[in-house]
């Protein structure tokens, strides 16, 4: 009985693991898209005002540099120190996916 319960519990956890992981797209929509745009182009009112980079075309930065800017901010971009390392990693991966 214990083995069956353990196996079932393990299967539930494994199948729902993605729900507990960081979701780069959701984080982007919540925290980044208002300036950087849904597609990373920066073609938003605030993005134009702040002259943000078009991440759908150019990404000349390392993952470590991107993570540092997300966590600590840079220039007019505010810091997101409250994000976990997993959240930051998911955001960096999502930014990479925006390049056309």
Language-model features, listed with the residues they occupy:
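Short, functional N-terminal and low-complexity linear motifs
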Residues: 2, 32-38, 56-61
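Electrostatic cytochrome c docking/interface patches
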Residues: 12-27, 43, 63-65
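Periplasmic/extracellular electron-transfer cofactor-ligation site
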Residues: 25-51, 75-78, 97-100
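Generic hydrophobic secondary-structure packing signal
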Residues: 17-20, 36, 69, 91
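Extracytoplasmic electron-transfer domains, predominantly the class I c-type cytochrome c fold
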Residues: 49-100
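N-terminal export/targeting leaders of redox proteins
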Residues: 1-22, 100
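Amphipathic alpha-helical interaction segments
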Residues: 11, 35-36, 63, 88
């Amino acid at each position: 009985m214990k083995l069956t319960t353990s196996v079932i519990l393990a299967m539930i956890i494994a199948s729902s693991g993605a729900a507990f992981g960081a979701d780069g797209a959701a984080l982007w929509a919540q925290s980044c898209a208002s300036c950087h745009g849904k597609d990373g182009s920066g073609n938003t009112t605030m993005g134009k005002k702040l002259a943000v980079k078009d991440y759908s075309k150019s990404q000349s930065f390392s993952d470590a540099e991107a993570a540092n800017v997300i966590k600590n901010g840079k220039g007019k971009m505010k810091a997101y120190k409250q994000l976990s390392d997993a959240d930051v990693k998911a955001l960096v991966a999502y930014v990479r996916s925006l390049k056309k």
